[in-house]
Amino acid sequence: MQSMPDSTRHPPLSYCKAGVDIEKAADLVEAIKPIAKRTRRPGVLSGIGGFGGLFELPRGYKQPVLVSGTDGVGTKLKLAVELNRHDTIGIDLVAMCVNDVITTGAEPLFFLDYYATGHLNNEQAKQILTGIGAGCELAEVALIGGETAEMPGLYRQKDYDLAGFCVGVVEKEKIIDGSRVRVGDALIGIASSGPHSNGYSLIRKILARAKIPLSQSFENKSLADGLLAPTRIYVKTIKRLFSEINVHALAHITGGGLIENVPRVLPSYTQAVIDSNGWEWPAIFHWLQKQGKVPIEEMWRTFNMGVGMVLCLDKKEVRKTLELLAALGETAWILGEIQSSSEEQPRVTITP
C-alpha cells in the first residue's frame, strides 16, 4: 500500500506565504477611502469597504434609463509598468468608460474599478487609485466601490490589469442613439490629447523595432510624456453642449479610429464623409507613421488621429457649437458631413 507524503517535514503554510497578503489589501482599502470621499456627490449612500456600493437616482426624472459602460486601458499599461509611472493611468481608465456612457446622452453618475496584480505593491496601487480618483473628479462621478485582486502565478509580480465600470442616467425621451441623424448634418471633431488609450500594441511594436528610448526628446518633452498623456475626459464639455445644442449623435473615437467608431452611431444608408485636410494631425501620429512605415489606411483604422470625440448636428448649429467649444477651452474643427449611401451598412469615407 502506497504511503502518504510526510507533511511534517514542511513548514506550515498560510495565505500570505502563498502570495496573498490580506493585511496589505486591508491597508489599501483604508488608503482608498479619502480618495473616494473627494469624489462624493449627491446620491451616494455608502462608503468604500462594504459588499455593495449604494447610489440613489437623482430626482426629477420622469422615465429614467440607466446606461452602463465598462472598459480597460489596454497595453498602455505595459508602458506604465516599464516606466514605473502609474499616476495617470487611472485617469485613462475613467475616461474610457465615462466618454462612452455620455455618448448616449446620459449623465455619468458613479464608477467602480477592478485592479488585478501578481503582487500587491501598495505604493503602485495608491498611484493608480489616486489617478482613478482624479479622473472621477474630472468626470463628476462618484467612486463608490471596486475590487483589488492579488493573484500570484496568474500575473507576473510587477504586472497588473485594470477594468472600469460606469453607470449613468438619461431621460428616456432624451436618449441619443443616432436615430436623429439626417443627411446634410455636420460633423465636428473635438481634439484628443494624443493616442489616448488605443493603438498601444502597435506603438510598442514600433518602439521595439526602431530601438527608440522613451527618454528621447519629442515636442519639448520626453517621448514617454507624450505617449502616457492621459485620455481626455469630455464629460463637462458634453454636458454643457447638451444644455444648449441639439446633438444628433456622438462617437467616442477609440480602438478602430474614425473608420470603425463613427458608423456605430449612424443610421442605415448613410455615410460620414470626412475631409482629412480639415485639421492638422498631432505630431505624434506623423512620427509613429514614419517610424513604423505604417500605411495611411492602417493609421486611420488604428488611431484617433487627433480627434477624441465626434459630434453630429444640424448645420445651422455649427457656428454656435464651435463658439461654445472654444469658450470651454476645447480645440474643435468641422470634419465633414453626413451623406446618403447606396449601402445599407453605415460607413466612413475619408477624402484626401
UniProtKB/Swiss-Prot annotation:
As one GO molecular function, the record gives: phosphoribosylamine-glycine ligase activity
Looking up Pfam families in the UniProt record yields:
AIRS, AIRS_C
Gene3D superfamilies, per the entry: PurM-like C-terminal domain, PurM-like, N-terminal domain
The pathway to which it is assigned is: Purine metabolism; IMP biosynthesis via de novo pathway; 5-amino-1-(5-phospho-D-ribosyl)imidazole from N(2)-formyl-N(1)-(5-phospho-D-ribosyl)glycinamide: step 2/2
Q: Which UniProt keywords apply?
A: ATP-binding, Cytoplasm, Ligase, Nucleotide-binding, Purine biosynthesis
Catalysed reaction per UniProt? Answer: 2-formamido-N(1)-(5-O-phospho-beta-D-ribosyl)acetamidine + ATP = 5-amino-1-(5-phospho-beta-D-ribosyl)imidazole + ADP + phosphate + H(+)
Tell me its EC number(s), please.
6.3.3.1
> Which InterPro entries has this protein been placed in?
PurM-like_C_dom (IPR010918), PurM-like_C_sf (IPR036676), PurM-like_N (IPR016188), PurM-like_N_sf (IPR036921), PurM_cligase (IPR004733)
A Gene Ontology biological process noted in the UniProt record is:
'de novo' IMP biosynthetic process
Instruction: Extract one GO cellular component term from the record.
Output: cytosol
Localization (cell): Cytoplasm
User: Which protein family is it in?
Assistant: Belongs to the AIR synthase family.
What name does UniProt use for this protein? Phosphoribosylformylglycinamidine cyclo-ligase
